[in-house]
Amino acid sequence: MNIEKAKRLAKEKLPEKRYNHSLRVAETAIKLAEIYDGDTSKVELAGVLHDFCKYDDLGKMYQIVRQYELGNDLLSYGSEILHGPVCAAIMEHEYGINDEEVLMAIKYHTTGRQQMTKTEKLIFIADYIEPGRTIPGVDDIRDMAYNQGSLDKTIYEISKRTVLFLIQKDITVYNKTIDCLNYYNYSDERIKDD
């Protein structure tokens, strides 16, 4: 799918505010890709489409989870977790996107996971730091992403803040988010490469 078609699809489906967020994620991911030698066309496509299913009916999302066998564990969660995996499945099976990196970046943009590809990392970070975000402490994360040279450390910090937020709100934390946090935790002295 070319980027113009992706933008057209997203604009037709998403509320204006969410569509603009998606464009900002794509733009932010491109900037990060230029810093970290990523694929700008892949991150642009994933950025534009990452929230394509965010407002889909929850019943429809559960149906997609079952239809494409995305994992029964997902059936315990709402749209905040489901929209990524559901969107990736729809983009693959209904829109013919077959680039695994783009699909994985869409699938895990909210939760993260262990051993993310560079494209996944760039979308995960861009979704958190795009200019429209006003999350407390986001400027520190932006500085880390743009100026401190480590995607992995940035992912760890985002995951840590996300998990702490969810715990404070008594919201169940998705297992892949915990796995992501643990995997990118530098305090255990594992060495990782961006």
Swiss-Prot record:
Q: What class of enzyme is it?
A: hydrolase
Enumerate the UniProt keywords alphabetically.
Hydrolase, Iron, Metal-binding, Nucleotide-binding
InterPro entries linked: Diverse_Catalytic_Enzymes, HD/PDEase_dom, HD_domain, YqeK
The name this protein goes by in its record: Bis(5'-nucleosyl)-tetraphosphatase, symmetrical
By its UniProt entry, which CDD domains does this protein fall under? Answer: HDc (cd00077)
Q: Which Pfam families match?
A: HD
Q: Where does ADP bind?
A: 21, 51-54, 83, 109-110, 127, 133, 172-177
